[in-house]
Amino acid sequence: VYKRQDYSCNKEVNQWAKSNLNEIKKMKVAEWYSINDIVYQKAAYVAFDSNQRKELWLSKLQETLKLDWTNAEKEHISKLIYLIEDNSNLFDNKVSVDDKTDLAIYQWKEYALEQLRWDHELIFSIIKTPEKLNANKKLDTSLYKTPATKNNSESDGNKQPLCNCNSNESHKWFLCSLWFHKCHIGVCEVRSKDCGDLWLYECNGLCV
């Protein structure tokens, strides 16, 4: 179980989160997006309560639904929205993802890949990050400003960096970002959630 009160692998970002924790706990969706740097946004997300996380993902998917899709694609995106709305404990860090939800997420990705012919980048952009898609169904690459693991062990003695990705999935998926595809199990402190699909799964590796 993740107990240590750290929020990022980046020492400076971690300190920012700790210093602004009260504000983060009251942060609305629009404020999260206004941070405009995914590493800082991820740190804020780690500090969020389950309702803040739920509202963020619902907002992202509802905005995604407004883009230009076929009816079949709209229906498929809506399935993720229903999944979130129907699971009150989905984003509770104390509750593991149940087998039914796990299977539903897996089947959602496979249908998107095999039936809708979505590529891995689009699937990543929808289900593996709460970042918004632009009109071209792409992520805003300018948000990747800050190194995810910079200074993660400086001046920390024997303290391990926080794990920041889930390494259990096939290598075919984008695991860390559109640029860092590999997640390797290494010397890092495992967190029970905040990685993988809908950021619901264990963080057990480091992006490389």
Regions found by a protein language model. Give the residues of each.
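Short, small-residue-biased leader/transition segments that mark boundaries at the very start
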Residues: 1-2
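Mature extracellular/secreted ectodomains of secretory-pathway proteins
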Residues: 10-158
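Secreted, short cysteine-rich peptides and small extracellular cysteine-rich domains stabilized by multiple disulfide
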Residues: 160-208
